[in-house]
């Protein structure tokens, strides 16, 4: 069969008319330099701050520097395979991480990917890593307690749900131990926990996970890991990822607790990124926005009101408030709290628990310095019985420290001063507590009651620990109903006072320690 030119032309026109091409507009750029986890991109015009950029090899970058003719981005993951001239694509999306109950009991990296070998995670969707904190109208004042299980903290520096309480001190003073015990104490409280490890050794993190598992607290906890071996970009993003995972519970009318361990290493990672991006350095070579780095993170810890929760859940949850309580950790150098990052975080938070090397080395653990430790909003959240009984504890310790300083230079002390010194020493001894042994409200109340009512006066100083252990064992075995009642109601009235007095009197009459 022969085709003439007219038929061929018609056939071609028909094919052209039928040809359907899908046009795709892509925002594409070219890598012009790669160094230390930082890439510079030319030609990526339509890009926003914090946008995810698709890189060759199924990895992503995050746009941080938007300049006139280039974009500076950090690589989330390995960057050794990237080279100049490679094409990159803007995604138009902000970084998101998986959230939901499926993350509880799991160890994940900054991007929410499981690293514990327990298989994939069933999440309830994704949420942005960077979120604007709830406004003033959406918040509610702090009025419910978070029990850490430590007598010294719950009595003198109480923490409320939705509070930001800084744990600050030199290295090896028990900061992480305090935070881990606070998590262990939440296993039956209904408070979900998030532990964010930033720039720590992998062996240290593995030990923390093992301890949480041993004490039955891992099932209630999400562990987010950005270890020392990971890039500065992942260490920088880790706290925001953990915060997003904690906000999932807050926004649904539940309570959550998040530990940032620690924000000193977080600031160092951000300083490294900023200097590599050639941002101008300021004090201690930190960039100018290092305050905003931590304030935008810690402001997300809050107690939100019922209207906020109802609006967020579209009416599914009514009459419930939600909270996210933050315990950021800061490591100081030689006790210098006036350095740049410590002063920043002190001014952002609602109080600080200051741990000192001197107290730690003297065997007073937790090494809390009651003189400069403070909780600015937690007093309103303290349980009634602990609030009534702890009033004299801080005063006794403050007077003891003052008198002890003078007593060094004076040998002839009057009886009143000697009695006060003796009482202060015993209260100091009583505030000591072993790691991984958090105490219930009733146990704390009983011990504080004994100190407040003078039951320790005839107990020798070196026997205080034995007296406490024997008293608690007796109370738990013989007066379990009273202990359960205090744990449930935390009331302080004449009936409770009489029953506690009778308990201690009968114990002292029938027991030795």
From Swiss-Prot:
Keyword Cell inner membrane: yes
EC number from the UniProt entry: 7.1.2.2
Keywords annotated in UniProt: ATP synthesis, ATP-binding, Cell inner membrane, Cell membrane, CF(1), Hydrogen ion transport, Ion transport, Membrane, Nucleotide-binding, Translocase, Transport
Residues that bind ATP: 169-176
Location(s), subcellular: Cell inner membrane
Entries under InterPro entries matching the protein: ATP_synth_asu-like_sf, ATP_synth_asu_C, ATP_synth_asu_C_sf, ATP_synth_F1_a_nt-bd_dom, ATP_synth_F1_asu, ATPase_a/bsu_AS, ATPase_F1/V1/A1_a/bsu_N, ATPase_F1/V1/A1_a/bsu_N_sf
GO MF, one annotated term: ADP binding
Main enzyme class: translocase
PROSITE patterns to which the protein is assigned, alphabetical: ATPASE_ALPHA_BETA
Topology of this chain in the membrane: Peripheral membrane protein
Source taxon at top rank: Bacteria
Site (Required for activity): 373
Catalytic function, reaction form: ATP + H2O + 4 H(+)(in) = ADP + phosphate + 5 H(+)(out)
Family: Belongs to the ATPase alpha/beta chains family.
Protein purpose: Produces ATP from ADP in the presence of a proton gradient across the membrane. The alpha chain is a regulatory subunit.
The name this protein goes by in its record: ATP synthase subunit alpha
Organism whose genome encodes this protein: Tolumonas auensis (strain DSM 9187 / NBRC 110442 / TA 4)
Native organism taxonomy: Bacteria, Pseudomonadati, Pseudomonadota, Gammaproteobacteria, Aeromonadales
Gene name linked to the record: atpA
């Amino acid at each position: 069969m022969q085709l003439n030119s007219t038929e061929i032309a018609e056939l071609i026109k028909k094919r052209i008319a039928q040809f359907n091409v899908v046009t795709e507009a892509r925002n594409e750029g070219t890598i012009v330099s790669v160094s230390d986890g930082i890439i510079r991109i030319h030609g990526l015009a339509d890009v926003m701050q914090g946008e995810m950029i698709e890189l060759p090899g199924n990895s992503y970058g995050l746009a941080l520097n938007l300049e006139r003719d280039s974009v500076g981005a950090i690589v989330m993951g390995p960057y050794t395979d990237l080279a100049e001239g490679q094409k990159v694509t803007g995604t138009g999306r902000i970084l998101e991480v998986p959230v939901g109950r499926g993350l509880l009991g799991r160890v994940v990296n900054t991007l929410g990917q499981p690293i514990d070998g327990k298989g994939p995670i069933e999440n309830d969707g994704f949420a942005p890593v960077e979120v604007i904190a709830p406004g003033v109208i959406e918040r509610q004042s702090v009025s419910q307690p978070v029990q850490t299980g430590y007598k010294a903290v719950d009595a003198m520096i109480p923490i409320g749900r939705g509070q930001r309480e800084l744990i600050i001190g030199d290295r090896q003073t028990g900061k992480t131990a305090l935070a881990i015990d606070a998590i262990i104490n939440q296993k039956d409280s209904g408070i979900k926990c998030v532990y964010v490890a930033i720039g720590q050794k992998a062996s240290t993190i593995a030990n923390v996970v093992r301890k949480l598992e041993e004490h039955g607290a891992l099932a209630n906890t999400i562990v987010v890991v950005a270890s020392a071996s990971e890039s500065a970009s992942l260490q920088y993003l880790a706290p925001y990822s953990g915060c997003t995972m904690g906000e999932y519970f807050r926004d649904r009318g539940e309570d959550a607790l998040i530990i940032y361990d620690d924000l000193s290493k977080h600031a160092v990672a951000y300083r490294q990124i900023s200097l590599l991006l050639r941002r101008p350095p300021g004090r201690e070579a930190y960039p100018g926005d290092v305050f905003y780095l931590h304030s935008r993170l810690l402001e997300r810890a809050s107690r939100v009101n019922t209207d906020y929760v109802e609006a967020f859940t579209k009416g599914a949850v009514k009459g419930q408030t939600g909270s996210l309580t933050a315990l950021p950790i800061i490591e100081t150098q030689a006790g210098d709290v006036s350095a740049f990052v410590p002063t920043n975080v002190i001014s952002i938070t609602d109080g600080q628990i200051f741990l000192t090397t001197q107290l730690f080395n003297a065997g007073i653990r937790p090494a809390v310095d009651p003189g400069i430790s403070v909780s600015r909003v937690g007093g309103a959240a303290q349980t009634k019985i602990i609030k009534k009984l702890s009033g004299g504890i801080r005063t006794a310790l403050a007077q003891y420290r003052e008198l002890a300083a003078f007593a060094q230079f004076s040998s002839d002390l009057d009886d009143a001063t000697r009695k006060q010194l003796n009482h202060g020493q015993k209260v100091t001894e009583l505030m000591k507590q072993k790691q991984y042994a958090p105490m219930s409200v009733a146990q704390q109340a009983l011990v504080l009651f004994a100190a407040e009512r003078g039951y320790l006066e005839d107990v020798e100083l070196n026997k205080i620990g034995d007296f406490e252990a024997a008293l608690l064992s007796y109370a738990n075995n013989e007066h379990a109903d009273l202990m359960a009642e205090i744990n449930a109601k935390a009331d302080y009235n004449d009936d409770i006072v009489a029953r506690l007095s009778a308990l201690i009197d009968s114990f002292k009459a029938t027991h030795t320690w």
